[in-house]
Structures are given as C-alpha cells and as structure tokens.
C-alpha cells in the first residue's frame, strides 16, 4: 500500500508497504541482475552500509541460470540471496526484446534463443508470471514489449519524404505493440491471481505492476496509460525510456506523470 507523505511542485514523497517491509519513495533500486551485486558486496553490506531499500533482479537471466525452479526449491530469492527486504523482478521483456536477431514476436509471446547456450525458449505473459512467482519477489513486472526507438534512424541529411516514411512506420508499429501489451497485461493479471492462490506459492502477496509503453509518441503514451489504468494494478512504471535523447525522456515523463494513477 502506498501512502503519500508530502508534495512539493511535481515532486512527491511517500512510502510503500509490502510483505517484505516498507521502502521510501523516491528510492534508488540497487541492481542485482543475477541475484547479487557485482563487486563482492554482501547482503549485509548492502543493507547496513549502502542502505539499500529495494534490490532489482533479472527474470530472464535467473530463468536461464541457475533456473527459477532451482531458486524456488531453495525457498525463493530472499533465502537464495539472504535478503529480507523488498525485491523487484523485471519481466524479462527488455532482455528478450534486446535479442533482436534471436527472437520472434507472436500474440502468444516471444520465441528466442538463449544467449548462453542457444537453446530455444518461449516466454509469454503466463510464463513470465510463473517464473517471477517461482522467484518469489515482492514486486513482479508485467510482460511487455520494450519498443525499439525507430526514430533514431532519422539523420539530419535525410529528406522529408524519407523522414515521414520512418515516422509513419514507427508509429504504426508502436501502436500495434501497445495494443498487444495491453492484451498481455490482462493475461499477466489473471495468471498472477491464479498463482497467488496456489498452496505452494512462495509469496502469496506478490504485487504486479503494469508498464506504460508508446515509444516517443505522446498520443500513444497517453492512450496506453489510460488503458492499463483501467486494470487497477498494484503500481505502474514508465517503460521504454532507454536510449532516447534526454529531452525526449523528460517530455514523456512530463505528459505522463499528471495522468498516472
């Protein structure tokens, strides 16, 4: 449960209560991709010296190795890591979609090859939720497509006709992707509810956050936020802002923050 403590202009300070403890917002999430911080930092150091409130772990990498089922057998990520504070797991979507030459997108999900051993893996909304449930994280992220920034193909010396062609193609792709991501979110929510009701689920109070997409197109971003807000998720994130120019990132945040739940 989120509690708003104070606001100042567009900024707000609050706290988020979870089954694994409370963290203050805004907060910095330390990244432990494979359930550990690089550099030999122990969980004790992370808590006592670095004052880490939330650790972020990577669903895709943990699924590939050591395997989410192995981690479940060990009691979940908290026991695996010797960590008793909140953990957020991403959906694996960003990593999957970054494997551009190794994956194929379908309505059901994504087929791709492991970057480790080349084996074929299928991941869709249900599979992502199942993996994250096996990990037992505090907060799970919905499976979405992290859309490539096709606008980066535009160069200063390009003529207007070529620019418009790229923009139109990027817009159409982004729109179709957003629509699919909404459908995937419905499937994620349904599967998470099912998993949280099972007797052998590690964290029966696992939270699920929806992710806003829409590339750099204002109308797509706003429409997508409106659609996913209807599902009344436990929280929301702004996705796909990785690699865009800083001014575009700030612009997207400026138009989205006032309308986010």
Which sequence ranges carry the predicted segments?
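Non-catalytic, usually N-terminal nucleic-acid engagement modules in DNA/RNA processing proteins
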Residues: 1-201
């Amino acid at each position: 449960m989120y509690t708003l403590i104070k606001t100042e202009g567009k900024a707000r300070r609050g706290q988020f209560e979870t089954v694994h403890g409370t963290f203050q917002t805004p907060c910095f999430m330390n990244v432990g991709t494979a359930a550990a911080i690089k550099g030999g930092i122990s969980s004790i150091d992370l808590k006592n010296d670095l004052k880490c409130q939330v650790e972020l772990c990577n669903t895709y990498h943990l699924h590939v190795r050591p395997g989410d089922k192995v981690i479940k057998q060990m009691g979940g990520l908290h026991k695996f890591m010797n960590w008793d504070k909140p953990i957020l797991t991403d959906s694996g979507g960003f990593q999957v979609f970054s494997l551009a030459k190794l994956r194929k997108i379908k309505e059901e999900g994504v087929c791709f090859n492991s970057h480790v051993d080349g084996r074929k893996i299928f991941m869709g909304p249900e599979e992502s939720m199942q993996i994250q449930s096996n990990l037992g994280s505090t907060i799970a992220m919905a499976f979405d497509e992290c859309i490539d920034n096709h606008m980066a193909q535009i160069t200063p010396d390009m003529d207007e006709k070529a620019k418009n062609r790229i923009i139109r193609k990027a817009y159409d792709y982004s729109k179709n992707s957003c629509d699919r991501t909404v459908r995937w979110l419905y499937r994620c929510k349904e599967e998470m509810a099912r998993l949280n009701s099972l007797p052998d689920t590690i964290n029966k109070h696992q939270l699920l956050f929806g992710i806003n997409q829409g590339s750099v197109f204002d109308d797509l971003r706003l429409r997508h936020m409106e659609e996913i807000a209807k599902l009344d998720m436990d929280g929301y994130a702004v996705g796909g802002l990785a690699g865009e120019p800083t001014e575009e990132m700030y612009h997207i945040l400026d138009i989205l923050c006032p309308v986010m739940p």
